[in-house]
UniProtKB/Swiss-Prot annotation:
Gene3D superfamilies listed in its UniProt record: GIY-YIG endonuclease (3.40.1440.10)
Organism listed in the record: Bacillus subtilis (strain 168)
The GIY-YIG domain, residue ranges: 42-118
Family matches, as SMART domains: GIYc (SM00465)
Tree of life domain: Bacteria
Protein's UniProt name: Uncharacterized protein YurQ
One Pfam entry name: GIY-YIG
GO biological process: nucleotide-excision repair
CDD domains associated with the record: GIY-YIG_UvrC_Cho (cd10434)
Length: 124
């Protein structure tokens, strides 16, 4: 098997509540994540959803990361539509090249055995 070095995440956010500090403006959570704004809006890359036990649930790629990740939480046809409540952590790697995104996504799905990916699965 070929060996591909997976890039380190540029952004990692976890589901959490905002601390009750009166000095800070209240942040409206997006699907339980108050740090969603840290995910790049106009960058392409790959993203990984994990549960609270750090098990990989889903891997995806996008030309616009934040928009695509939000769509997974709102879309009625997303492969994780019945499992959204399991997502506790999101990792994002900025990858500009579309071909590299495709390679990383397929490699991660099949070497780390993501639980809810349907396409590009060769290990089942």
């Amino acid at each position: 098997m070929i060996k591909i070095d997976i890039p380190a995440p540029n952004v990692t956010i976890t589901e959490r509540q905002q601390s009750a500090n009166d000095n800070e403006p209240k942040i409206k959570p997006i699907h339980g994540f108050i740090d969603f704004h840290q995910i790049p809006r106009d960058k392409g890359g790959i993203f990984m959803f994990y549960n609270i036990h750090d098990e990989l649930l889903f891997v995806g790629k996008a030309r616009k990361l934040r928009q695509r990740i939000k769509k997974h939480f709102e879309d009625t046809v997303s492969p994780i539509k019945h499992h959204r409540d399991e997502v506790y952590k999101i990792e994002v790697c900025v990858v500009d090249d579309p071909m590299e995104r495709e390679i990383y996504e397929t490699y991660i799905i099949n070497t780390q055995h993501s639980k809810y990916n349907i396409d590009k699965v060769f290990f089942k």
